[in-house]
């Protein structure tokens, strides 16, 4: 059979259209495809919830690909090994409570497991605003990342979600939108974004879990976005806190969706 270029185009357009239409209303929208966002999405999808993940870049994975300074190994502490085990990601003991994993294997497996669990992943999509009702986030306003990068005047599309997770890391992209458009209303000490502090790995890892919480009705922060929002330090290339943060935010949202 001779391949037909138009049939190839139709197949891609039809399937993407089906996926997009099916995910205009979801239980949870995850913004950011790094480790915390992927773990959260995976846990939620495995529990039977409808989850869509939006990543502004072409590739999924956040900063995990490069390990530290492009040395593509990561460190995970013992308390988070159960997440690696559940996802079938290999690791090796380096020293007491320090385990290493191949960064490429880790993030590619996280992505694969999330997709296989039923998470709808949309890459190259930017969240430019939130959809709001009185005192609550109820969805996202989306556009293509290249549209934003080119500075084109193109109106966005909106989608609805019962809960939104900002897992955009240092940038805290969704929280910044809320802080700008609904000022003084964040559940931080100042009502504003407190800002990320300089590196302190031990403190950062514990605060990552503490700061994984609802920052505005309907909007949760996870991973480094939590520390950047609530004023915690950065942790470097140790990822146990990221994995556990994704697990925690999923558990809290699942409890509220019951």
From Swiss-Prot:
Q: In which pathway does it act?
A: Cofactor biosynthesis; thiamine diphosphate biosynthesis
EC identifiers of the protein: 2.4.2.59
Q: Which GO terms describe its molecular function?
A: iron ion binding; pentosyltransferase activity
Q: Does the keyword NAD apply?
A: yes
Q: Where does glycine bind?
A: 234
Where along the chain is Fe cation bound? 155, 170
Pfam family, any one: Thi4
Q: What does the record give as the reaction this protein catalyses? A: hydrogen sulfide + glycine + NAD(+) = ADP-5-ethyl-4-methylthiazole-2-carboxylate + nicotinamide + 3 H2O + H(+)
Annotated NAD(+) binding lies at 36, 55-56, 63, 127, 153-155, 224
Function, in words? Involved in the biosynthesis of the thiazole moiety of thiamine. Catalyzes the conversion of NAD and glycine to adenosine diphosphate 5-(2-hydroxyethyl)-4-methylthiazole-2-carboxylate (ADT), an adenylated thiazole intermediate, using free sulfide as a source of sulfur.
Tell me which PANTHER family the record gives.
Answer: THIAMINE THIAZOLE SYNTHASE
- Subunit composition and interactions: Homooctamer; tetramer of dimers.
In its UniProt entry, what is this protein called? Thiamine thiazole synthase
Q: Which species does the entry assign this protein to?
A: Desulfosudis oleivorans (strain DSM 6200 / JCM 39069 / Hxd3)
Gene label:
thi4
